[in-house]
Amino acid sequence: MERTFIMLKPDAVKNKHIGDILQRIEKEGFKILGMKFLKLSLEDAKQFYAVHAARPFYNDLCTYMASGPIVACALERDNAVAHWRDVIGATDPKEAKAGTIRALFAESKEANAVHGSDSVANALQEIAFFFKGYELN
């Protein structure tokens, strides 16, 4: 079994898509190991997205991610990282395949409903950012 980290972004929470996305998580065969509803501080967002610090969108991304509540989840299933990336679709919802989470729920390339780890190594780091080991089932 493989683990991945996902986050429902402020737009998905604001637009009341939490239930729909959680249903999709279960339908896709993921086990939810841990889940938290919280609001990131700007400092936390900057630390979480530090890998993008040199990119031109970094400050706007961090400000956006600190703008409202998020839902952080640690998930598990076979091929979890790649499968979740397929389920969420392209970063830009205009390019996302029909039926993917971003095609269904994203507002824009920036407010694109969900985050998903892009590798197993990053998934483990991202899970550790939000969860202590004893918090995971």
UniProtKB/Swiss-Prot annotation:
Keyword Ubl conjugation: no
CDD domains the record matches: NDPk_I
Catalytic activity annotation: a 2'-deoxyribonucleoside 5'-diphosphate + ATP = a 2'-deoxyribonucleoside 5'-triphosphate + ADP; a ribonucleoside 5'-diphosphate + ATP = a ribonucleoside 5'-triphosphate + ADP
Record's subunit section: Homotetramer.
Protein family (similarity comment): Belongs to the NDK family.
InterPro entries in the cross-refs: NDK-like_dom, NDK-like_dom_sf, Nucleoside_diP_kinase, Nucleoside_diP_kinase_AS
GO molecular function: ATP binding; metal ion binding; nucleoside diphosphate kinase activity
EC number: 2.7.4.6
The protein's name in its UniProt record: Nucleoside diphosphate kinase
Gene3D superfamilies in UniProt: Nucleoside diphosphate kinase-like domain
SUPFAM superfamilies according to UniProt: Nucleoside diphosphate kinase, NDK
Keywords: ATP-binding, Cytoplasm, Kinase, Magnesium, Metal-binding, Nucleotide metabolism, Nucleotide-binding, Phosphoprotein, Transferase
Compartments it resides in: Cytoplasm
A family per Pfam: NDK
Lineage, top ranks: Bacteria, Pseudomonadati, Spirochaetota, Spirochaetia, Leptospirales
Binding site for ATP: K9, F57, R85, T91, R102, N112
GO cellular component, one term: cytoplasm
Protein's UniProt keywords contain Nucleotide-binding: yes
Entry superkingdom: Bacteria
GO biological process assignments: CTP biosynthetic process; GTP biosynthetic process; UTP biosynthetic process
Cofactor entry: Mg(2+)
Function: Major role in the synthesis of nucleoside triphosphates other than ATP. The ATP gamma phosphate is transferred to the NDP beta phosphate via a ping-pong mechanism, using a phosphorylated active-site intermediate.
SMART domains, sorted: NDK
